[in-house]
Amino acid sequence: MNTTNMYRILFLLSLFMAPFCAFAAGNNPNESKVVTGSVLLDQKTPLDAKVLLAALKTDWKIRTDSANTGEKTIVFSAPGATIMIAYLDYPVAPAEIKAAAQISWLWTKAAAEASRHQAQAVISVIASNGKMLEAYKLFTKVAACVLEQRSASGVYMNNQYLLVPKGFYTAAAHNLLSNQTLPVYCWVYFGIQQEKGKSGGYTYGLHEFGAKEMEIANSTHQLQDVQAALYDAALYVIQNNAIITNGQTIPVQGEQKITVRLSKAVYLEGDTWKLEF
């Protein structure tokens, strides 16, 4: 099935979900936003709704109220959100997976492993625009539950061009459940590169949380330090729902603070926050 047909199916499913969306957004669907991504399944076998819903309750401590299940869909309400899981009996477009795999440093074997998936479970979490952190937490737990219930290789977040392998993803999700540690690497892509002896990097995914992306350019620091600084800055923004102002300092790498300034993007499009690092 081609991409056009896939989005047609998802559109029809979204119509079915309209009443649930209204509930999740405080009866005002105009204020809702969707977190979406795909679990890459190894086999063309629909999900077992009964088993999955039970695992979400017992293993992941998620309330699954008002559950409505079909042959290929599972829809239920959780506190502050509505979740839909749609089984699609065809893979994510190979071109998408190939492009994401080429930049995937977290999943070094993604080109070979992710491309072998046969089907996908598309997970959508609908929540109010001001609750994106909670929506991403829910998404992560649901995705990890699907990963543990089925033979699957990983998760693909299409809005971030992000591929995350199964082992890393489930470990991060359990750490979120047990320790409330935010799995930022499962939500935001961190690109790094070195040119002419200088290091640089950028985030791609902060837009999901209503924030501008961040960049570091022409840094004399090592690549791993650039990535660590970007990670700490992204964590600060997501964790605190922080609204950054020009010239503000934000904490990174322990007690160190870095000044951020808004300017034209170096690696991305539009304007980004530059970390003076």
Q: What do these predicted ranges mean?
A:
Residues Q43-A111:
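N-terminal low-complexity, intrinsically disordered segments
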Residues Y90-P183:
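Internal, hydrophobic cores of structured domains that mediate oligomerization or house catalytic pockets
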